[in-house]
Structures are given as C-alpha cells and as structure tokens.
Amino acid sequence: MERVRQMFSCVSGMIYRPTDSIAEEYHKWYYGNFVWNTTTWMGIKCLKSVSDMWNYQEILIELEPSLVIEFGSRFGGSALFFANVMMHIGQPFKVLSVDISHKDLDPAARQPDILFIESPSTAPAIAEQIRRLKNEYPGKIFAILDSDHSMKQVLAEMKLLQPLLTAGDYLVVEDSNLNGHPVLPRFGAGPYEAIEAYEREFPGDYEHDVAREKKFGFTFATNGFLIRK
C-alpha cells in the first residue's frame, strides 16, 4: 500500500503544482481529472477543452474561412464540430483532417464536407493536397495542430504550413500547455517549445492573438493562437 501511495504521489506531482492563480489551478484540475477525455461533440469524442471549442467557433464565424486544416483526427469529433460550424456560415468549404492512423475514427464523423486522410501530416502529399484544396476553395484558412505533441513534429508541421498560409489566416497550436505551461512539467519539449523555436527562425510570420488566448481564463493552446502576418 505504501508503494502505491508513493507512486500516486509521484504522478500527482507531475500533473499538479499549486500556484496563486485561480485560473491556473482550474486549468490543472481540468486537465488532471481528464475532463477533456470525456468531452464529445454530437456523441463523438473530441479530446479538447470546451472553452477552446467555443473560442474556435467564434474565430470561424469571424474569419469565415473556406478551408479548415486539422492535423490529428483521432475520433473525428473535432472535425465534425468544425464542419458543423462551417455549415452555419453557409459558404462552400472543406475540412481536411489528417492523422497517421484512423483506427479510432468514429464512422459517424464521416461527412461529405470532411476529407479524412490517413498519412503522416508532414508528408509532401499533404502539402500538395492543401494546395489543391486552396485552389478549389479559395479564401481564408483556419489550421489547427493536434497530432504528435513532440517539439520536432509540431515544428515540422508549422514549417510545412509556412508557404501555404497567407496574411490573415489563423493557426492554433494545441497542447502547448504541456511541459509545465502549466501541466505535465516533466513532459519534455513539446508544442510550446516548437512555437518558440519557429519564432526564433521566422520571427515575423505570426502575431499572437492574446485576447483570444486569455478570453476564457485558460486554454490548452498556451501561446498558440496565431494570426499570419
């Protein structure tokens, strides 16, 4: 029993570190209790913060993009969410959702306006597919990165999108709350560090949408609401 208590204490310490910030404490509680792991859209898992999802629909309504790019499909709930919001906007659109494996994809997520592709997100074929969709659905782009959370992968995805996004397009880098920002301090370099590395290399590409990031008090996309300049 003592060994179990020690193990639990170790795991809890990785997830929860008290601070004086109420918002940060709530963030840690929300993440550490896996609320995000039981969040669904129309019955399909999303694995997101509900306040982030609300923020995304506000961004989509304001931006009125014609193309939504999602790296990381998993169950398909978020792709369906984006498609449902886009249908309300009422203009031609496509949601491109890419994942290295669609074994967990819920069949109910498959809709005519969503193109699911099983592939590494950084494959040249994905960049080419995005170019084709840009021609077919001209206009603004909303892109969101939520696949492998390693720094290397996220940085590669940001670089893949660099020549494909233009001024006014929107990029969200999710799970940048990992590695102590403020959850899972021992995770290792992840999305947050990828954003920092990208901005060191390409300092003029993005403006941070701080108002969006701070709107609901916490976000899983810490430092990751980006508007292309």
From Swiss-Prot:
SUPFAM superfamilies: S-adenosyl-L-methionine-dependent methyltransferases. InterPro entries: RhmsylMtase, RNMT_CmcI, SAM-dependent_MTases_sf. Belongs to the rhamnosyl O-methyltransferase family. Its EC number is 2.1.1.-. Pfam families: RMNT_CmcI. This is Rhamnosyl O-methyltransferase. One of its GO terms (biological process) is DIM/DIP cell wall layer assembly. Keywords: Lipid biosynthesis, Lipid metabolism, Methyltransferase, Signal, Transferase. Gene3D superfamilies: Vaccinia Virus protein VP39 (3.40.50.150). One of its GO terms (cellular component) is plasma membrane. NCBIfam families: RhmsylMtase. PANTHER family: RHAMNOSYL O-METHYLTRANSFERASE. One of its GO terms (molecular function) is methyltransferase activity. It is an enzyme of class 2 (transferase). Residues 1-23 form the signal peptide.
